[in-house]
């Protein structure tokens, strides 16, 4: 049975063999999920030949570790193949926006839920795409996300444990990251510091900072500057052997 809130958007048929899959985590400040960062993004990934799974993870009034539990359960479900799609279990990634980017980054840095069946290396993605992420809860953090996820006055040790840039290791998966320099909701330093930590650990990272653009652009169609992110990301996924051209099939299949 599929985990709560998980829906699949299959890549078009036409290629033999298993394909990569990506878990999509929409943003919304851990208070809601933004629809424009959910199924439309999954459909874009599917057009690249990647199976996509959208997770409507738990949000406030549920607190940590509920969203992380949901995300890890979804990752394990995607890898184990119970969904019936031909997924390559060695190529399962994550894509997150804003607070969903925080959830994606904490998956990548193996943040703990305290549940041994979920705190499994198989729940760590093989790559990540982070879109204007809330990467830090300690430095220029998005306070709304902090309050919705952790409540009032969370302990500093927990804030540190859930700040992705402080928990990067050489085993953290590669990342494609983008942000806008004038994001007034989630400062660009979140992306800069996470990318810096990845590079310092020897982890491949591609970072794009666009001079202008409001927070929450999603696919950013028609937006000068940020509207390039999907083509840049598709090229990155192609170089990694995960994607074909739009409406095509995944490379290597």
Regions found by a protein language model. Name each.
Residues 133-167, 173:
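Mobile cap/lid helix-loop segments that gate and shape the active-site cleft of serine hydrolases
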Residues 18-27:
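Short beta-strand element of the alpha/beta-hydrolase
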Residues 21, 46-53, 93, 206:
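A fold-wide structural signal in alpha/beta-hydrolase
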Residues 177-179, 183:
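Short beta-strand/loop motif that positions the catalytic acidic residue
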Residues 1-17, 143:
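N-terminal cap/lid segment of alpha/beta-hydrolase-fold proteins
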Residues 188, 192-253:
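C-terminal catalytic histidine-bearing segment of alpha/beta-hydrolase fold enzymes
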Residues 73-143, 159-160:
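Primarily recognizes the serine-hydrolase "nucleophile elbow" in alpha/beta-hydrolase
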Residues 33-36, 40, 53-91, 220-228:
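Catalytic nucleophile-loop/oxyanion-hole region of alpha/beta-hydrolase
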